[in-house]
A protein has these predicted regions:
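ASCE RecA-like P-loop NTPase motor cores
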Residues: 1-312, 316, 320-323
Length: 323
């Protein structure tokens, strides 16, 4: 029996899971999950996610724990609906050295959250350093996105100008996000929301086909009807359009914390250390949120706590649920 089959069998007969799903129906519920040890949280949470649907953000204590949790959900759920939301910086936001892979994973997650249809589920695994960073708000993400579909009447010159305006760099062959190339009637472009670039074939001023392709072999992997090309949101979005990820995801999202108090203290520590290292401290609010701001943005959401150590004015008294 596979892990998913075991999960389905468990979900069908568990009274405790039924209680958990009933609590989930309360939009602003705060629930303390008692007596969960080892991998039990992953199992119960995956069952609740599959049964209840919606957007679920799991906040582990560090990057490694978040990655392990993601792997658990890969085995228990549809891995296409499980996303990793890491930090976009190699060291600290103060030094401005981006981690390209982290930026792509963050952008892909934001794109998935923004386009969540309301049916099914979406799981996000993250940790304090990533949650502390501000992101482009939904309006800015929409504004910066270049949408192209098969059959669109658009010239290569117009598309290229849009890519230049979005700070994409022209190269001979694309190999990393933020690049594009033009060869005859073909435009290759590497969006910050994808692990593979797109190849757009033009017939005159009409988009004839869109495909993903492998960088090394140059072979197409799949055909697409429509794509959304997203630039580096860290570079192109003004401070006034930056919000916490909790605000971006909205009050409908649910949050699962291994140790909420640790996460909030860590967010404040990151902000304080970054502030002391910054050459222009007045820019801190464009980079990082604060403990109090994050709490305020979480106040209308469902919160599930593995440890009942979050006694704060912004969050309701937790319901105790023994599993």
């Amino acid at each position: 029996m596979t892990a998913r089959e075991q999960l389905a069998q468990f979900a069908a007969g568990s009274k405790a899971l039924g209680k958990l799903c009933r609590e989930y129906k309360n939009r602003s519920a705060t629930v303390h999950l008692e007596e969960l040890v080892g991998g039990a949280l992953s199992f119960y949470a995956a069952a609740a996610v599959a049964k209840s649907g919606g957007v679920h953000v799991f906040v582990a204590e560090d990057r490694d724990a978040a990655a392990y949790l993601m792997n658990d959900f890969y085995n228990l759920l549809d891995e296409r609906q499980v996303y990793f939301f890491p930090s976009s910086w190699k060291r600290s936001a103060a030094y401005g050295a981006e981690d390209a892979q982290g930026v792509v994973q963050r952008t892909a997650t934001m794109h998935a959250v923004r386009n969540f249809p309301g049916k099914g589920y979406l799981v996000v695994c993250t940790y304090p350093e990533a949650l502390a960073e501000r992101v482009a708000d939904a309006e800015a993400l929409q504004r910066e996105t270049i949408a192209v579909k098969v059959g669109d009447r658009i010239s290569i010159e117009v598309l290229e100008q849009a890519l230049v305006d979005a700070a994409f760099t022209r190269v001979d062959f694309v190999y990393e996000p933020g690049q594009y190339s033009v060869r005859g009637g073909i435009v290759d472009v590497f969006s910050f929301s994808e692990s593979k670039p797109y190849r757009l074939d033009f017939f005159g001023d009409e988009v004839d086909s869109i495909r993903r392709f492998n960088i090394s072999s140059q072979l197409s992997s799949d055909k697409l009807d429509r794509v959304e090309i997203i630039p580096d949101l860290n570079a192109g979005v003004p401070a006034s359009a930056k919000v916490s990820f909790a605000q971006f995801a909205g009050a409908e999202a649910s949050y699962w914390f291994y140790d909420a108090d640790f996460v909030l203290r860590r967010v404040n520590d990151i902000r304080r250390r970054t502030l002391s290292d910054m050459e222009h401290p007045d820019q801190i609010d464009s980079l990082l949120t604060s403990r109090n701001s994050l709490l305020a943005d979480l106040s209308g959401s469902r919160i599930f706590l593995l440890r009942d150590n979050l006694s704060l004015i912004h969050i309701s008294e937790p319901t105790r649920l023994q599993l």
